[in-house]
Amino acid sequence: MKRLLAGIGAVAATLVLAAPAHADVDTDFTNELHIYGIYGQKDYNAWIAKITCKRLNKGVDTTAAQSAKFVHDQLVKDTTTEQAWQFLGAGLRLYCPDKLPLLQAGQ
């Protein structure tokens, strides 16, 4: 019985002490944006993506085109339309993947 309890205790301790492996989504998002030549503050860019998801969830934007325009309007002046769409795609994939069909529909 003591061995069983010791074994259970060891397993429990291992599970408690094991650090969960959580990726930093904001950092992953920033790294992807850099591939597209989009720079800026990590927190600000993540905020834009999260607000974009919220706007879609609340029905403020109902199409990907409306969301891309919102994103474009928030980014620096020299941002291209293509970059806004790339930003939108990355944002939807990382922060609200349930909205990806909107992007895939091209609306």
Segments from the language model and where they lie:
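Short, low-complexity, Pro/Ser/Thr/Gly-rich segments in the mature regions of secreted, periplasmic
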Residues: Y95-Q107
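Short N-proximal segments of mature Sec-exported proteins
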Residues: D24-Q74, W85-A90, L94
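Classic N-terminal secretory signal peptides
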Residues: M1-A23
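Mitochondrial intermembrane space
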Residues: A13, A19, H34, Q104-Q107
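Hydrophobic alpha-helical elements and their junctions with loops/disorder across both membrane
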Residues: T14-L17, L56, D98
